Amino acid sequence: KHVSVCYNNVSIYEKGGFKMKVVVAIDSFKGSLSSMEAGQAIAEGVKRVYQSAEVVVRPLADGGEGTVEALVEGMGGIFVTKEVTGPLGAKVEAVYGVIESKEDSSKTAIIEMSAAAGITLVPEESRNPMNTTTYGVGELILDAIEKGCRHFIVGIGGSATNDGGVGMLQALGYDFVTQEGKAISYGGNGLRELARIEEANVHPSLKECTFKVACDVTNPLCGENGSSAIFGPQKGATPEMVQELDQLLLHYAELSKEINANADRFYPGTGAAGGMGFAFLTYTNATLESGIQIVLTETKLEELIATADFVVTGEGRLDGQTALGKAPIGVAALAKKYQKKVLAFAGAVTPDAKECN
């Protein structure tokens, strides 16, 4: 028996006695299919032709929108809904994921910052980083700690904030206070009031926690390439606000050295998400990592690809931007390492997608 399918001069086949192993890791088709739904559809198609094939489907995401859904669905976790403080101070319902390790029963929380402090939660006419806070992100972390999580994967894209992560740290028990010892207010306005930082009331379990922060930008906290200058305008900052916020974050960074002498506002990525990169690196046990690399590591995709006969990946739109580090390229790079053939599926393919080859 010999069944063959050809695509772009690539042949995948099945002969008597040979059991083909196909690894499928495909990003979501936004608005249509989640990562796992797309992967299962491809798996079903493969099995229709090669009944004896072993098809392994793994979730895929780049650390941004859809990462919680992809990892929770793909790794047998649960979704948790929690009411938290939104970016404007009003309550919002946010969802995060919890995955329990089958090896040692440890729990990992998967959190997207945008669920609690995202730009989509703020009407366009209300976007103003002097007012918006990351407090709700800290509340999600606290809730996960109370549920036994000590490992965290946090995606920090899509934020509405420029508070240096101060709101998140306030929720975790750090006291950011005025000259009179009162708690500062939310957002950039609160940074105007900041006189000192105290750590006596930090949640005791925070020191036991590790954070992998999905960060794919290299901007420092301050300066012409910093958080306020590069990302502030898209969050509603006027040129005057940008200048003031930059100075306020500089003051915050200097005060932070009293808590952590190694606080480094120049470190690449500290300017990510309005300074959340700086907050995580300075105040928690965190690393800033490529979003796709975090996902590939957590799903142990490399081990699967190493023993695969064929690899399938893709996303909603395959174009020149895909080649610049989006999720399917991470999969393709692993496949190339082990000299595996790769097929990509997409909802749309543009002419410049040839850059992916």
Residue ranges, per PLM feature:
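N-terminal loops that bind phosphate or other acidic moieties
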Residues: 7, 16, 21-156, 160-357
